[in-house]
A protein has these predicted regions:
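Long, compositionally biased charged/polar stretches
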Residues: 17-609
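Fungal secretory targeting signals
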Residues: 1-21
Length: 609
């Protein structure tokens, strides 16, 4: 029985990895474990270059880094350049070693728990109904994912409200409000069905700014693996004036007979339509996070490594935020997105299409730096402060995210104002300006603020966004979230196992479309290994994002005080999120499940997986 890549095999694969100067991944028996990147000591005090009496040493260090830490071609699709060079390769290897160390206990638990889960369902006689999927979770996975699946995720998996509100929580990066001034209605829906479901017409919903679209039609270009199937769904959602809820209106498959489903269809037809959409959405979330958080934060930091002295305070902050970041894509290349690897074993589309998605989405959607600022992105998609439609009654991603974002920004503002007493001082920082120039030049960061930057506000925005990507945005789509919400079976399979229907009606059993016992446990165990439960006891949660002595002691008392306030704020937010309960309508944040995906006391401060 092969539930997962064994710990020994994974460790061997990673220990054999080397990134050559040309960026190709190859095998090597040499394992470099340098104690320091370049031999320069870790600073105890930070200083700007214009205030440093040993500027020559700074320049020597920067030149050495530029010579030995270089750009090499992207891996896992054509996204951002990766880290190479003699020292750069050592950094990657060092971070991979730490990553393997963190993975090992989780993988041990997941392997043991996966076998127990599989035995439990086999003892039951297999998956005979949709309710049987609960057996795969009950009493299992407490080691790898101590919190288990989100309350309400299984008991309410047929709920239309749950399906709709996941677009505003567990994967909030797809849905957008249709703008009646510039968009068109993407597909037609039977008028009688629309009136029955909404009390109005499709055109009226559109013109009032109450119609929303989540579009995965691009996946029609992808070819599923043998024995796997997928649609390429578009889904329409609407604001229901009668109930005050955000609800689904229709799902269009865009393959085969190109059927349009609505909640008025036979229950099995409609549930299958939601499952088909989720197959597309699950694929999107996992690869989008790679191109949006990993690829973007890595290249911004790599440009900083090559232009900032280790004595520069911004360098110190970035290295905290980018803890073990360069382990992920390099390891994923050999153990997750390799041909026949873990991704191929579970998802409808192979690693080839994961790479295609990353390549296609990085330059236009996932990778642009400024366009993906937290509030800017939500405004651009009409989800925040839209002038052409009513406010969303509930938006959990924004409700939780805004509090965390504001706290991060407040700390960063103090940090920047402490370093730079005026905008003029910032403009005179040659290393900082070199970083901005490098990011726009050799690093090829998409949509980065142009050089030079002239205000502290611009730097605050840059650093806040990096912190948001590494410590929050990443974990909404990855880390423990796929196990607890966005990958919970039976509603969220990684693939269909029967063809997309060519006609409606006559479906008596949805099990043929869903993974069998073995494939279900493989999916669950893969997602369990994304979690990192030990970060709580290791003080590596978001609450501790800035709590590192070298950074705090080297930048002044105001920064220490700002960190104390940040930790208090994160503690308050964590308590609020972790103690959520259902209200008297059986809802939490307007949803029939309890979402804790942004709990600062549980999620890492860094790009963990």
């Amino acid at each position: 029985m092969r539930l997962l890549l064994s710990i020994t095999s994974l460790t061997a694969a990673v220990n054999a990895l080397a990134v050559r100067a040309d960026g190709n991944v190859t095998s090597s028996t040499a394992v470099a474990t340098p104690t320091a990147w370049t031999g320069f000591p870790t600073p105890t005090q930070y200083a700007l270059p214009q205030n440093d009496q040993n500027l020559q040493e700074r320049n020597v260090e920067i030149k050495l880094k530029r010579d030995t830490i270089t750009y090499v071609p992207s891996i896992i699709g054509e996204t951002s350049l990766f880290m190479g060079g003699s020292v750069g390769t050592q950094i990657v290897r060092q971070e991979q070693a730490k990553w393997i160390q963190d993975l090992t206990p989780v993988q041990q638990d997941a392997f043991r728990e996966g076998n127990a889960s599989l035995k439990a369902i086999q003892d039951h006689g297999g998956l005979k109904t949709l309710e049987d999927f609960k057996i795969l979770y009950d009493g299992h996975w407490s080691g790898s994912v101590p919190g288990g699946i989100a309350q309400g995720q299984f008991s309410n998996f047929t709920s239309d409200l749950l399906f709709a509100m996941e677009r505003l929580s567990t994967n909030p990066y797809v849905v957008r409000r249709l703008n009646p001034n510039s968009d068109k209605i993407p597909f037609s829906v039977d008028a009688n069905n629309v009136t029955h479901l909404t009390g109005t017409t499709l055109d009226a919903l559109f013109k009032s700014g109450s119609l929303f679209l989540a579009d995965h039609s691009y996946q029609a270009e992808y070819t599923a693996q043998d024995g796997r199937y997928s649609a390429a769904c578009q889904a329409l959602f609407f604001l229901d004036e009668r109930s005050g809820h955000f609800l689904p209106l229709a799902i269009k498959t865009n393959v085969g007979s190109d059927l349009v489903y609505t909640p008025l269809d036979d229950p099995n037809d409609w549930l299958l339509a939601k499952i088909m959409y989720n197959v597309n959405d699950f694929f999107h979330g996992q690869i989008y996070h790679l191109a949006n958080s990993h690829a973007v934060a890595e290249i911004v930091n790599l440009a900083a490594i090559r232009t900032l002295s280790s004595r520069h305070p911004v360098f110190g902050l970035l290295q905290r935020l980018m803890f073990q970041a360069y382990a992920i894509r390099a390891t994923g290349e050999v153990a997750l997105f390799n041909p026949g690897g873990l991704f191929d074993q579970s998802f409808a589309f192979s690693n080839v299409y994961a790479r295609k998605f990353a390549t296609d989405f990085y330059p236009t959607v996932a990778g642009p730096f400024q366009a993906n600022y937290f509030e800017e992105d939500l405004r651009a998609r009409g989800l925040l402060n839209a002038s052409y439609g009513p406010e969303l009654p509930h938006f959990p991603f924004h409700e939780d995210g805004q509090k965390i974002f504001d706290a991060i920004r407040t700390f960063i503002e103090t940090f920047v104002d402490t370093i730079y007493e005026s905008d003029k001082v910032l403009t005179e920082d040659s290393e900082l300006q070199a970083w901005i120039t490098e990011a726009n030049g050799p690093a090829k960061v998409v949509d980065f603020p142009p050089a030079p930057i002239n205000t502290r506000k611009q730097l605050v925005e840059i650093l806040t966004h990096v912190a948001w990507l590494t410590g929050v945005s990443h974990h909404v789509l990855n880390q423990g979230e796929p196990f607890t919400t966005s990958g919970v079976l039976p509603l969220h399979p990684a693939s269909l196992y029967a063809p997309v229907p060519t006609a409606k009606g006559g479906i008596k059993d949805l099990l043929p479309w869903l993974p069998n016992e073995q494939k279900s446990v493989e999916q669950i165990s893969l997602l369990a290994r994304f979690n990192r439960p030990k970060i709580v006891e290791n003080n590596e949660t978001l609450l501790h994002m800035f709590h590192i002595e070298t950074l705090l002691s080297g930048t002044g008392e105001a920064v220490k005080t700002a960190n104390e306030q940040f930790m208090m704020t994160m503690g308050t937010i964590s308590k609020e999120i972790s103690t959520r309960k259902f209200d008297d309508q059986g809802l939490s944040q307007g949803m029939p499940f309890i979402w804790t995906g942004m709990d600062p006391g549980v999620i890492p401060f860094y790009l963990s997986v």
